[in-house]
Amino acid sequence: MTKTRLLSQSFFITLSFACFPVPGVVLQFRDGLNEEILKYTNKFRESKHLPALEMRDDLNEIARKHSEDMAKGRCSFGHSGYEQREAEVKKIITPFYGMAENVASGPTTGKEVVTLWKNSPGHRENMLGNYKYTGIGTAADAKGSVYYTEIFVQ
């Protein structure tokens, strides 16, 4: 077998394994989902004559980490570690006036997760609160269950 053919086959085998998810590995659910969630969140706020939220990459990263922690089982589903996330946000947003957080698991589209939150009194209150910024993060576990975190900051 020629050296070129051997290298070519090795590359193909390596590439083949790289295309399959490894059990336990968390993946971002899909591109554009954060923007879709933002769109429906702001559409809901607009329907109540509230200003649109501004999505920030630094807040997205904080939200993504929490979704990933839930997907990997490093924390239970919910608001574990909220105080630490709030402390991180306080370092980024100054002056800091307040923060709220919504989490969810199950829906597969931005519209579905926002509808779920709209129909829950506490989540709805967060979405309609006096906030200026948002951070959104998603992660899927090895079984494909999607975890969502949206934080709201003033």
Question: What are these model-predicted stretches?
Answer:
Residues T2-F11:
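Bacterial N-terminal signal peptides that target proteins for export
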Residues S10-A18:
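Bacterial N-terminal signal peptides
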Residues C19-Q154:
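Functional surface patches built around histidine and acidic residues
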